[in-house]
Amino acid sequence: FEQKSQTEKEDFLFFVSLAVVSSDTNVVVANIVSEKIKIIPFDEEMVDSVIGNFRIKYRIYENEDRLPMTNPPKGEKVYYAGSDIELAVDYNEKNVLNGLIKKDYFKDYFFGYGIDITQYGISSLRILSVENEVLILELQICVPDTDLCCYFILKIDNEGLMKVEELFDDFESD
């Protein structure tokens, strides 16, 4: 994976105020108001680790998704950058899985609870263990800066087949 430098910054987008005037009547027919939008970047994470007979490499990086802040400061629109995961798994030094993990892969789990997945983003991935030649990972998908999360267990066998299990969620208590 390529390592991309991540700077401590916040992106700002500005829309310019514009009034459209009819040339026939000199009447304003449209008015576009200026607006400041703040985008909080995602901090990229890279892991390259060996556990048992598995080598796992993954990179969690910022994508083009924009997740709205639940309680932005008054008069501001604030978004968090979303993320995707590049994942590569080797077993006994042979590559068995290369893939991209996107939050949309999990939308059916959210649909069952009537939850709008557009507010959620991939938060983290961590290596848990290896059991019976199966690599076990935990994936967390959350609404940024809240405790609304859904956890998934990803089980990857020595042939690269992945099984997804919902581990725990906050939806059932709602």
Residue ranges of predicted features:
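Short, low-complexity, Pro/Ser/Thr/Gly-rich segments in the mature regions of secreted, periplasmic
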Residues: 155-174
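A short, structured loop/turn motif at beta-sheet edges
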Residues: 90-95, 126-133, 155-161
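Acidic, glycine-rich flexible loop segments
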Residues: 108-147
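Short, exposed beta-strand-loop hairpins at the edges of beta-sheets
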Residues: 5-8, 141-161
